[in-house]
């Protein structure tokens, strides 16, 4: 790979640290603040050069869609720092679909993403209702199994129609609001939902 300038290296290191810490890449604004740049267009220019040099891959149609090319999941997790979680069916982040409760495969996740006694599973996102939270169509979300949630948390919820969906959870005075992270989509309202777990991370294959 072509050598990076000092500023490009700062941006690349920040993106890597955010992906490792949060499971998804930072926004252009967050990058600008982190490395001391005032202009979003300057950040875009550096990202373009990082892409041309083979360090990242971007999808211009999706926000936050920055993939670190050298961060293949298998490579970034040393054997003693990884655990394996089952991929259970598929959950739609858009139009809910009935959850399929069978294990399709196992994938490595960071041991630091959950405690040793936590039950975790992975679900595949099908849809674009959470793109503004950095959760894209085809991503695998890492979910800590629990039956409670705090307002504002991203959860996997089973609706009254026994369909599962990934949304941001809000308990209001007399209803539950499941809020998409997509300005083009409306919230969903229910008298009651069953919380299956809280999203604690994200697994993204790099193709």
Curated annotation (Swiss-Prot):
Say if the entry is tagged with keyword Disulfide bond: no
Gene Ontology molecular function:
DNA binding; serine-type endopeptidase activity
What is this enzyme's EC?
3.4.21.88
Question: Can the keyword Cell membrane be found in this entry's annotation?
Answer: no
The UniProt entry annotates the active site at 129 (for autocatalytic cleavage activity), 167 (for autocatalytic cleavage activity)
Q: Which reaction does it catalyse?
A: Hydrolysis of Ala-|-Gly bond in repressor LexA
InterPro entries this protein is in?
A: ArsR-like_HTH (IPR011991), LexA (IPR006200), LexA-like (IPR039418), LexA/Signal_pep-like_sf (IPR036286), LexA_DNA-bd_dom (IPR006199), LexA_repressor (IPR050077), Peptidase_S24_LexA (IPR006197), Peptidase_S24_S26A/B/C (IPR015927)
Enzyme's top EC category: hydrolase
Q: Which GO terms describe its biological process?
A: DNA repair; DNA replication; negative regulation of DNA-templated transcription; proteolysis; SOS response
Keywords per UniProt: Autocatalytic cleavage, DNA damage, DNA repair, DNA replication, DNA-binding, Hydrolase, Repressor, SOS response, Transcription, Transcription regulation
Site positions (Cleavage) are 93-94
Which Pfam families does the annotation name? LexA_DNA_bind, Peptidase_S24
DNA-binding region, residues: 28-48
Q: Which HAMAP family match?
A: LexA
- Protein purpose: Represses a number of genes involved in the response to DNA damage (SOS response), including recA and lexA. In the presence of single-stranded DNA, RecA interacts with LexA causing an autocatalytic cleavage which disrupts the DNA-binding part of LexA, leading to derepression of the SOS regulon and eventually DNA repair.
State the family named in the UniProt similarity comment for this chain: Belongs to the peptidase S24 family.
Q: How does it assemble?
A: Homodimer.
Name of the protein described by the UniProt record: LexA repressor
Per the UniProt record, the source organism is: Oceanobacillus iheyensis (strain DSM 14371 / CIP 107618 / JCM 11309 / KCTC 3954 / HTE831)
């Amino acid at each position: 790979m072509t050598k990076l300038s000092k500023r490009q290296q700062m941006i690349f290191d920040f993106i890597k640290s955010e992906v490792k810490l949060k499971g998804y890449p930072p926004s252009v604004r967050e990058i600008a603040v982190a490395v001391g740049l005032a202009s979003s267009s300057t950040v875009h220019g550096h990202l373009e050069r990082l892409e041309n040099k083979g360090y990242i891959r971007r999808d211009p149609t999706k926000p936050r869609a920055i993939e670190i090319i050298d961060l293949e999941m298998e490579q970034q997790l040393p054997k003693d720092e990884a655990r394996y979680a089952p991929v259970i069916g598929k959950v739609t982040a858009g139009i809910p679909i009935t959850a399929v409760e069978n294990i399709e495969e196992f994938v490595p996740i960071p041991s630091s993403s959950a405690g040793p006694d936590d039950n975790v599973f992975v679900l595949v996102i099908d849809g674009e209702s959470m793109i503004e939270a950095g959760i894209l169509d085809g991503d695998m979300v890492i979910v800590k199994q629990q039956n409670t949630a705090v307002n504002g948390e991203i959860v996997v919820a089973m609706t009254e129609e026994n369909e599962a969906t990934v949304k941001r959870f809000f308990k209001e005075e007399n209803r539950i609001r499941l809020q998409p992270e997509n300005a083009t989509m409306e919230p969903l309202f229910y008298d009651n939902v069953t919380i299956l777990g809280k999203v604690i991370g994200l697994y993204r294959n790099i193709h």
